[in-house]
C-alpha cells in the first residue's frame, strides 16, 4: 500500500498579559510546508547578514531593515493579524519583542521544522528508484 502523509500543523496559543492585568490569547496555526521552512531559512540568513551589518556600524537604515526582517519572520510564523497584535502589545519595542519571542520560536517552532525536514528526507530516501 502506498501512503501519503499530510503536512504537519503547528498549533499553539500565546497569552499576552497586559499591564492592566487583562489578557489576550493569540491562536497560532501554521501549516509546516517545505516552502514555509525555506522562507524561514531565507529570513534567518537575512537577519544574520543584517546583524553583521549592524555590528560593523549602527545606522538608522540598518535598524529599520532589522525591524522589517523581524516583522517578516513574525508574519510568516504567526500571521499578519497576530503580528499586528504583538507590535501593539510591545508598543513597537523590537528589542523586548525579539528577546521574548525568539526563544519561543527556537524552542517550539524550529524543532517542528526540523522534524518535518527529517521526515521529508526519509520519505525521499524510501521513494528512490
Task: Indicate where each model-derived feature is located.
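Low-complexity, flexible helical/coil segments
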Residues: 7-13, 63-66, 113, 123-124
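C-terminal charged interaction modules
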Residues: 80-129
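Residue-level detector of alpha-helical secondary structure
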Residues: 37, 48, 71, 99-102, ...
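Contiguous, amphipathic alpha-helical segments that mediate oligomerization or scaffolding
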Residues: 56-70
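Conserved catalytic core of Hanks-type protein kinase domains
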Residues: 77
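Short N-terminal mixed-charge amphipathic segments
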Residues: 1-58
